[in-house]
Amino acid sequence: MADPVVRWRDDGTPFSPRFGDVYRSAGPAGALAQARQVFLHGCGLLPTPGQEAIWRGAPRWQVLEAGFGLGLNFLTTWHAWRQAAERPRQLFYTAVEAVPPEPDDLRRNAAAFPELAPLAESLIAPWHGLLPGVHRLRLDGGQVQLTLAIGDVQPMLAELTGEYDSIFLEGFEPACNPQMWRLHTLRAVARLARRGARLATRCVAHEVRERLVACGFEVEGTTAAGSPPALRARYAPRWTPRPRRSGDEAPMVAQPARCAVVGAGPEVLWLERAS
């Protein structure tokens, strides 16, 4: 019998048998605070004393996450967008995930965060039939669009087009998931970043920092002792990136090649769902 995507430990920690690492810490309060501190504050999406959130007044905002996991960063971002003053009219969130969790795992994880639980139920409603490939879930009346790229991180990133304003790198630790942190993967991330885009990650490994710099990111610092491990960077290449597709629309995937389907019958697989 195959291992489950998520194995729950006795202390409530969700664990990945495939990668041999935990999705988050055992304490719900700490996990939520870490998501906000590392990723939302790290990318300037929450206001601070004397500083507005950087997405305030923007017509749209595009977030790219490598490592969707159990959706905590997505739900936290969605919640922050809902609470934001002069929020962007549209939030596009694109996430790559090797193996999507089951709806029950999403629900069990979100149950630890009461303010996120209603959003999690809206996410779970269209969460079915997530075969390898790209799926778009329309949420909050279409104002929030979640694009899920299901598959290994590097080839999935290669399928995406567009320019992203915020980037979350949330894969498991390099020792557990080395593909996530290889140079060619980070180059694929850089290809999708607009100039000035902010990046945040919990990974502070020296070799990852060096690879980000090689890809055109300026590392702005890591958190001080006593704070959650985190790294912040800004995409500021010294070279001129190749022209790319405008970011005025929802993130897209590369145009597929033609194919023939034999014996499909009347069934049609819809990759875009609305809640």
Which functions belong to the PLM regions below?
Residues M1-W61, W78-E115:
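Rossmann-like AdoMet
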Residues M180-R195:
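A short glycine-rich, Lys/Arg-flanked "PGG" loop and its adjoining helix->strand segment in the class I
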Residues V63-E65, G69, A95, V261:
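Class I SAM-dependent methyltransferase core
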Residues L70-L75, G265, L269:
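Glycine-rich SAM-binding Motif I of class I
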Residues R107-L160:
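S-adenosyl-L-methionine
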Residues A257-S275:
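N-terminal Rossmann-like FAD-binding beta1-loop-alpha1 element of flavoenzymes
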Residues S166-F168, R195-C203:
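Conserved beta-strand signature within the Rossmann-like core of class I S-adenosyl-L-methionine
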Residues A205-A257:
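Class I S-adenosyl-L-methionine
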